[in-house]
Amino acid sequence: MAIQYNYGTGRRKSAVARVFIKPGTGVITVNHKPADEYFSRETGRMIIRQPLELTGNTSNLDIMVNIHGGGESGQAGAVRHGITRALIGYDETLKPILSKAGFVTRDAREVERKKVGLRKARRRKQFSKR
């Protein structure tokens, strides 16, 4: 018999996370590494555990994540979004709890493009009066 996975795609900035959830012991692997090894900063590890702690599923689900693009913060946000979507597929009754916490909504903020004639997106050259 095939193992039943629940799937969720999470996105944040330019990072895309594909998350697979199955009943298990609470092991989280990100790109074939333990989550604690993959995310070097504590904030990243904390962000990916938020939906699990909120729903009380920290020790009864195994999570496998494939992620690409973005930096550490964006990837952590993408994993959180993916875990949230996969949890909703796993148990529909969790959706109101997760939406109230704001985990279901995709954070639409993206990097603003650099404009011609400026140093960065909004930074101008220093103005000299004389």
From Swiss-Prot:
Superkingdom to which the source organism belongs: Bacteria
InterPro entries given in the database record: Ribosomal_Su5_D2-typ_SF, Ribosomal_uS9, Ribosomal_uS9_bac/plastid, Ribosomal_uS9_CS, Ribsml_uS5_D2-typ_fold_subgr
Coiled coil regions in record: none
GO molecular function: RNA binding; structural constituent of ribosome
Alphabetical keyword list: Ribonucleoprotein, Ribosomal protein
PROSITE patterns xrefs: RIBOSOMAL_S9
Pfam families to which the protein is assigned, alphabetical: Ribosomal_S9
Gene Ontology CC entries for this record: cytosolic small ribosomal subunit
Record GO biological process: translation
The keyword Ribonucleoprotein is assigned to this record: yes
Alphabetical list of NCBIfam families matching this protein: PRK00132.1
UniProt name for this protein: Small ribosomal subunit protein uS9
GN (gene name): rpsI
